[in-house]
Amino acid sequence: MAEFSKCSCLKPTKWLKGKVIGSGSFGSVHLAMDKATGGFFVLKSTDSEAGFKCLENEVEILENLDSPHIVKFIGKDLSFEANGKRKLSLFLEFMTGGSLADVAEKFGGSLDEEVICLYTKGILKGLKYLHENGIVHCDLKCKNILLGTSGEIKLADLGCAKRIKDHKVKGITKSLSKSIGGTPLWMAPEILRNEELDFAADIWSLGCTIIEMATGKTPWGGDICTNPLAAVLKIACSNEMPQFPSHFSDVGLDFLAKCLERDSKKRWKVEQLLDHPFVSKGNSVKIKNFKVASTPASVLDGGIFSEMDFSDDQLSSDEDESTSGNALRDHGFWISTRGGKMDLESSESWINVRN
């Protein structure tokens, strides 16, 4: 296992809080300025209990990392409001290029395969660093991948990340299972089945993220979201696969097949994927002066900028919604507790319910 190296960034002692650039039920994200240097950084803050736990986990992960492929942790601040409520704030590197989701939107909803190759290589370098340090990201998707002005890739939003001691956890305990999160439509089948957590889960999510970059859509398509129960069961238990981009080259399709192998033990590892011809295709792509609207990948956890929340008219009846939730509980799958409704594109408030 690689040795942890503490981030050497200096926490700003005097700073100005700017406008809100993101918000969610867990908290808010502000642009901030270091008064000593004039430099910009991102301020994530929360005073909710759920958001506090998420940020605490992100701090615990990020403060021991130092990589050009991971968003930099600058510092943290714990304060108390007038009512005695705790407020936790994180100071993070500001990535001016926005997220991959922003980029895809700015360029018509999808990206060219050669550019995807380039970005995939950057994502793999970030995953390689995390995995060498025994960390599973657990919520890899376009919203949680940030870009600099020159197109450099950095992984962000590690609120769901888990450190695996000895590179594997077998027979996950109840307490550990409850802390595992992610976004269901990007989750590996074995994770939805509440099986062991391993680095292979990130590889599956990488495959889903590549489909997202190539199509501008969720990896399983929009129709799957109309029935949450069927969606989770389909991903977790069927032999079906996300639809691969029809315009992809044979090399690209082969790369996806290596990522989206249902048997996690047969799924390729980061080191193998870095040597795949699909990744080397991106070496010829050079992106200069790359600029898009600057936004955070997400707020306090992937999925706060959620595109979908199941309303009553999307389910046939309240009884159907209740039946879906009960059926998932019976099977020991993951369910969303967000507002009592299931949201497959959000990683917020997903818990394991197996006793």
State each model region's role:
Residues 18-24, 29:
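Protein kinase glycine-rich loop
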Residues 28-48:
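Glycine-rich ATP phosphate-binding loop
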Residues 66-76:
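Conserved HxN/HPN-centered segment at the entrance to the catalytic loop
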Residues 80-93, 97, 101-102:
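A conserved loop-to-beta-strand element in the N-lobe of protein kinase catalytic cores
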Residues 119-120:
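Activation segment signature within eukaryotic-like protein kinase domains
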Residues 202:
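Conserved catalytic-loop aspartate of Hanks-type protein kinases
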